[in-house]
């Protein structure tokens, strides 16, 4: 009998507890039923790049054309940033050039419908700096001639960036003729260098 009384008290207590909850104003938390996916706003695939001649000046020839025609490279500013840049090659070629434009490397170069990245052999996610050559001096020690061999180099397209191997690289495309890059230029050759 004692067990029956205890069971009845327990049942009454539970029923009373349930009745008291009805009067409370607290509601269950509101749970959102749909998932919202937002795109990541930061660029996780950005390729580190630099303006030529600012952070690094000495470069080792890494392509066959650079080893045979130009040799290693030293790049330096003549004055403040935005002014002329001197490209001094170990094989006796010296070029002074004035930057005149910065374009995305994936834009058209005017060479057979190719982008600057394709012409230079660079990364399409970086910029290409376009230079107008002011002076080109070719020493007699430069057996192959200048960057455009016997023709005068008129324009350069340059990119400095970190490649897939994690190395800083410097890529140059040399153009002869009157047409600027982007307007039917005559591509002479492309040269590749790695940081020393």
Feature names for model-found ranges:
Residues 82-123:
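Central antiparallel beta-sheet cores of small beta-barrel/beta-sandwich binding domains
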Residues 19-22:
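Bacterial signal peptide processing site
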Residues 61-94, 113, 140-151:
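Short, solvent-exposed loop/hinge segments that bridge or flank secondary-structure elements
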Residues 43-67:
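Tryptophan-anchored aromatic micro-motifs
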Residues 26-45:
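N-terminal low-complexity, Pro/Thr-rich disordered segments
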Residues 119-196:
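Beta-strand-rich cores of mature extracytoplasmic or soluble domains
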Residues 1-17:
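Sec-dependent bacterial lipoprotein signal peptides
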Residues 53-56, 74-84, 160-169, 196:
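Short, solvent-exposed coil/turn segments at beta-strand boundaries
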């Amino acid at each position: 009998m004692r067990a029956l009384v205890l069971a009845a008290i327990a049942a009454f207590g539970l029923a009373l507890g349930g009745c008291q909850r009805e009067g409370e104003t607290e509601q269950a938390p509101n749970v959102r039923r749909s998932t919202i996916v937002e795109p990541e706003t930061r660029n996780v695939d950005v390729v580190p790049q630099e303006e030529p001649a600012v952070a690094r000046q000495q470069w080792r020839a890494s392509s066959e054309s650079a080893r045979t025609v130009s040799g290693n490279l030293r790049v330096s500013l003549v004055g403040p940033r935005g002014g002329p840049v001197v490209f001094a090659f170990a094989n006796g070629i010296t070029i002074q050039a004035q930057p005149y434009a910065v374009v995305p490397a994936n834009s058209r170069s005017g060479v057979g419908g190719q982008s600057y990245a394709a012409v230079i052999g660079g990364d399409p996610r970086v910029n290409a700096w376009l230079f107008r050559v002011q002076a080109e001096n070719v020493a007699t020690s430069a057996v192959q001639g200048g960057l455009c061999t016997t023709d005068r180099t008129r324009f350069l397209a340059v990119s400095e960036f970190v490649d897939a191997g994690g190395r800083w690289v410097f890529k140059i495309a040399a153009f002869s003729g009157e047409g600027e890059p982007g307007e039917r230029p005559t591509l002479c050759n492309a040269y590749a260098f790695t940081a020393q």
